[in-house]
């Protein structure tokens, strides 16, 4: 329990009360959807281990979901790859204002944790549904279940297949939990084996 309490201190120290977001890196006010999903995992664990009480959990969850529901999306589609944790604004990887694309893998991880929270704490179901229903997945997954991320090239969005063995299947699981067909992204093939 001591280790869990010590680990939770990271999320206490790096919590931004203006947005309910947590810095992905110690004392650096930026985060991704992947890192924000990690915060949801930590928040859930802290609550279920009794490190924080229901009131603290609710305060943090309500603020986080309120911010998630109002984030300005990349091209009005999906969350940008990075956000400033103090302002909640879209940023690039140097934490300067702007948009840089979206990661289907990061969003897939967020979808996993939104589903877990919704199932374990149904009182947050409406807020979570509002988040997911506000996202436009049309460029993130195709009818065959292939995941696509986005980046900007000369100011125009480019959508490219996104995934690596393990990460892609994990991201696909998040989409699958919300009813998407992920047959292509859920399959580890093609891959090759090497003799060692």
Per-segment meaning from a language model:
Residues 1-31, 75-78, 82-83, 177:
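Low-complexity, Ser/Thr/Pro/Gly-enriched N-terminal "stalk/linker" regions
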Residues 1-12, 40, 58-69, 111, ...:
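Hydrophobic core segments within long, regular secondary-structure runs in both alpha-
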Residues 6, 34, 59, 105, ...:
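Short, well-structured alpha-helical interface segments that form or flank functional binding sites
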Residues 11, 15, 40-43, 47, ...:
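Short amphipathic alpha-helical segments enriched in hydrophobics
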Residues 13, 48-51, 70, 119, ...:
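A generic secondary-structure boundary signal that marks alpha-helix termini
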Residues 19-24, 51-57, 123-130, 186:
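Surface-exposed patches in mature extracellular/periplasmic domains of secreted proteins
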Residues 27-102:
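Membrane helical hairpin/interfacial module
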Residues 74-107, 113, 117-196:
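Extended ligand-binding clefts on enzyme/binding-domain cores
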